[in-house]
């Protein structure tokens, strides 16, 4: 196949107007591109929901090219370390533009070429109807050999002129993410986090500074989140922009300043950070990892609403391709791991838990880690066969345990790590080296485990056979796919560069997931990675549930749950609720409250609970099922603003997006400090106790009094009777219109 040419396109050819403008829009988004004979195509205008259309405004000063391509033989046009100002990007020239439909998406493709190097680029923008968001991706090819070390997935000109403000007024929101401390959000003026004003009136060159985040290896959310938010302008022209990178591997995003403008650049792996490169020639082209952005009037909460709608559209489109529906979003799941068995299941332990979970009326009982262990706890470096333990479940065996789960009215769930093989596993000897990540001529091992390379036919065949065997033998309804091994920078097998091998595996793995889902659309699969260490939308548009953390302390879990909707759909947030009999009432409510407005992921020794405590857990499940009825039509909000990881008061909730009088919900946690707080609610809305319902807790068992005091049409004061940790979920009853 000759890759050194443009991909044929049957779409409608778009015409550039007399002013050199190419305008693309729907009812919400408007993008204005400027085409010149002596310059690359630039994004000179951008607007979204609630903003004045960009096509009615002057072009943004200092607009940036729509794609950047960094090569080792031409570099940048100036000396800095950003992903922008690439020489190849600056030499691209407009060839053609096309619009067409792909499923529900409206697509614009802009083709450019550098006649000197032979580089071709096809930059694609796509949007769903009714959503103020756009997906971006580029294909690059070359007529001659060209070594490429970075390509942008998106390169946005921030519409500062349209917002009526400058760089000095820009605020940035970003998040740290590490094991047991996910969703640690921060906010700061851009000028204070790496982009100082260097006075370009005196210094005659583009500033070289940037604010950037990146990830390494395969934990795409293991250090930082692959998204950010930017707010700009004031008053009626105030607007916000959010972006995300949809890749289950390394990524980078940055904010940088030009002479007259600001850019956001985002993409997958690159040479400087990830040892990635690709050499283009007539047989080799390259497609970037996808990225998306949303833009609208208002602040960060309004633009998160739009990204929530976009994530739903991405997920719905993928479900349709794989022949699935949204039924999985109604399931209540019990898992035996968290603060309970911790990966040490036996028949004697499981049967009482199964009976207890059955009495609660949950839909799925998941046996977490250990069901395959015949080594009395020494399974970590022996996994890979995924065959049931011969000594943990007595005469019943795993089949008998599965039968007990079904007799109790629940579906079976099983834990699995598809991508790893223990160094002591028989599978390690059966598969060739080419089935694993290798460096320096040896298999890569991490903590006693090898990492499968899903580009390998042997690796895929092993896991295909494994999944089909388990499904045929045990008829599970649910899988928890975990991921606890990080293989480093990549693999040298069938790759010119280590990062190239890693990218190839990452893409092959999601294709394997698509194939599995297509063969078994009835399967519900959780995405877990030591909690939420790989919670990106390459994975989450395909899988159904995301464990938001492995955090065992409900006091810390509260802030993780409170911030989860910034990056994960509410209907995919598996927030653990691990109530125990020995907890006082308020501690039990505190942990259960985390899952009510997301996805209540139950654990705990339910077999040890008395009837009074079981009523409380049933009350949580009943409240959660009420939320699930309308959850997919609601968007997140934060009545106390951005959750602070060390904050005393935390709050998050759901509001109906459409103009209707559906009920919204607010979860609020008090972890200490002042005994009262004022929350903001929609105009005319009232708060009603939702969980726990009256009678489920009382003062004799440690209950705290909560008092609700309306102050005006949009503010309510909440007061607690003492400083002990406590939480409540309130229903938000709307007036006739919510927006």
Q: PLM features: what roles do these ranges have?
A:
Residues 295, 299-300, 340-343, 371-376, ...:
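Flexible loop/turn segments at secondary-structure boundaries
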Residues 325-465, 478:
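Aromatic-lined carbohydrate-binding/catalytic grooves of carbohydrate-active enzymes
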Residues 138, 369, 373, 403-407, ...:
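Active-site and adjacent substrate-binding regions of carbohydrate-active enzymes
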Residues 2-37, 41-256, 274, 688-708:
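Polysaccharide-binding surfaces and accessory modules of carbohydrate-active proteins
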Residues 26-27, 54, 509-734:
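Active-site-proximal substrate-binding groove within the catalytic cores of carbohydrate-active enzymes
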Residues 262-272:
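Short, structured beta-strand/loop micro-motifs enriched in basic residues and often containing a Trp
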Residues 294-331:
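Terminal connector regions
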Residues 28, 278-297, 725-732:
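Short Pro-Gly-centered flexible turn/kink motifs
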